[in-house]
């Protein structure tokens, strides 16, 4: 029984046909029998398209025995047969997608070759690079003590500057406070003098 069902069932899975049908904005609730009939119709349509494309490919093959169905042969069939003319937009979209895939493949290949070139170039001049590194090391060893001494001198100068700045700021604050204190004392002495004057008479 199961073998009979498999033989009578469509090649396209009914669940996938149902999913594709639900993508249509004008989809209406459809029975399983109608969906299986649609699957059979799609199977017959694809079979007819492939047969027509193969016939045109054989006519253009110029005596080749082995044929391969390509997108170009399907495109030719769509252009020459009126009953497949509605597929022109789909064929254009397929061609765009295949062109993008080819560009991606081409972009991937030059990147690999460029990386290999970058790796190979330093290997050609290994001796020159070693000599240059040795010269740079000698020069840097001679210059390092000078830089260290300069850094030490700079750090000492900065510490001296900081200490003089801090002392100067403390003194200025102290002088400012002392000036305020002097002003307060002078006011208080005036008051005391006034008190003595008031007590004398």
UniProtKB/Swiss-Prot annotation:
Extract the ranges annotated as region (Disordered): 102-165, 178-201
Q: Which UniProt keywords apply?
A: DNA replication, Nucleus, Phosphoprotein
Q: Superkingdom of the source? A: Eukaryota
Q: Which residues carry this modification: Phosphoserine?
A: 186, 188-189
Keyword rRNA-binding listed? The answer is: no
What Gene Ontology cellular component terms go with this record?
Answer: CHRAC; epsilon DNA polymerase complex; nuclear replication fork; nucleus
What the entry lists under InterPro entries is as follows:
Histone-fold, Transcr_DNA_Rep_Reg
BP GO terms, sorted: DNA-templated DNA replication; error-prone translesion synthesis; leading strand elongation
The protein's location, in the record's own words, is: Nucleus
Stretches with biased composition (Acidic residues): 117-144
The record makes one more remark, namely: In eukaryotes there are five DNA polymerases: alpha, beta, gamma, delta, and epsilon which are responsible for different reactions of DNA synthesis.
Q: How does it assemble?
A: DNA polymerase epsilon is a heterotetramer consisting of POL2, DPB2, DPB3 and DPB4.
Listed name of the protein: DNA polymerase epsilon subunit C
- Phylogenetic classification of the source organism: Eukaryota, Fungi, Dikarya, Ascomycota, Saccharomycotina
């Amino acid at each position: 029984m199961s073998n009979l069902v498999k033989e009578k069932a469509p090649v396209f899975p009914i669940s996938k046909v149902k999913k594709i049908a639900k993508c249509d904005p004008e989809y209406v609730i459809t029975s399983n029998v109608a969906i299986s009939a649609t699957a059979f119709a799609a199977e017959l349509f694809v079979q007819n398209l492939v047969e027509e494309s193969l016939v045109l490919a054989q006519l253009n093959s110029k005596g080749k025995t082995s044929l391969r169905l390509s997108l170009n042969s399907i495109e030719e069939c769509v252009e020459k047969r009126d009953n497949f003319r509605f597929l022109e937009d789909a064929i254009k979209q397929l061609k765009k997608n295949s062109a993008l895939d080819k560009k991606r493949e081409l972009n991937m290949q030059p990147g690999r070759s460029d990386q290999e070139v970058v790796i190979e170039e330093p290997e050609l001049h290994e001796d020159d690079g070693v000599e240059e590194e040795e010269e740079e090391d000698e020069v840097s060893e001679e210059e390092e003590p000078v830089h260290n001494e300069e850094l030490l001198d700079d750090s000492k100068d900065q510490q001296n500057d900081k200490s003089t700045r801090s002392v100067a700021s403390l003194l200025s604050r102290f002088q400012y406070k002392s000036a305020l204190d002097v002003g307060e004392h002078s006011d208080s002495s005036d008051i005391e003098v006034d008190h003595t004057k008031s007590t004398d008479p």
